[in-house]
């Protein structure tokens, strides 16, 4: 991605919601590499899909020769950002936040190159400058530059002030000052001149721009990426089970891959622009090919492959594809013990059972059948498989060889209804 027209290229991909002084920023980028940053607050023990677009934007800038700073908010995570939140966040302990900081720093690291010369990425933590700051310094050196009149008129805060059931605490109201000071600090330490973030961060970003100008007399810029929406109006990045996380222990690579496979045709080509590094020409060619093929579109598989590889690496992608193929074909011989652990985590419904159970009881306990009577009929009708093998004996008791790796048995009713037994 060439640096001189980087903003235009991001706009072509639909990746720019708002930008401050676009012309001046384009000029600054044309002069040579800049340092830029994006902040990630540790509000949970993992990043989720909502963080992926700004994180990949940092990567896009680095690929164009710029220096990314990934800021993990060890201090701001203790306070909580009120922007567009309906209610006050629960405050977490310092120990919890520190634990989450470490996890998020490790999650961010694989997306950026920390050893590539001049534009090597930097990992920063705002606890480094806020941890020992006293309240008088905060109020005198930072607070005096902020107008409360302007702060209460910011859209992100106004919504909370206008709610009768939920006001805003001074703690959360102060968040804007903390994030603003982050920008000024990073400008002084690393020469950072651009902050990127989600569109909900616009108010915090512009505060940082104003504060940096007042404290250091430097012109800096802000760019927000859009809130990702789905064509049908439902929320992006959520499943029935909740958020889709980047941590494989919270959302398995298989489940992650399946999330992208299930992308609607109306969204898939847009998402390829947001979440992959394919060129616009490649994406348009794929769309044209899908339109004219007369078959099921290929785009969902391309999207799932590209994003799963980005987040979980080649091994994670291959495991996800292997599990998908085995569930489709019914042959489980290629699955490893780790693959079954992914299925047990969130891949298919799971039930724990004591050894000595019979098949009818397993079908009832797994909710594949409502009663033993119904289970008997279903088994007799040849509609049940155990580890991919048909079983038509209603009196069947599980054998040791049915317990793969001594732990797992996969039941299937019909073509698509699965349950994994984890033996105690």
Curated annotation (Swiss-Prot):
The gene is tyrS. The keyword Transcription does not apply. Homodimer. NCBIfam families: tyrS. The keyword Ligase applies. A motif ('HIGH' region) lies at residues 42-51. One of its GO terms (biological process) is tyrosyl-tRNA aminoacylation. Its main location: cytoplasm. A motif ('KMSKS' region) lies at residues 235-239. Residues 357-414 form the S4 RNA-binding domain. It comes from the Bacteria. It comes from Escherichia coli O6:H1 (strain CFT073 / ATCC 700928 / UPEC). PROSITE patterns: AA_TRNA_LIGASE_I (PS00178), S4 (PS50889). The modification N6-acetyllysine is found at residue 144. ATP binds at residue 238. It is found in: Cytoplasm. This is Tyrosine--tRNA ligase.
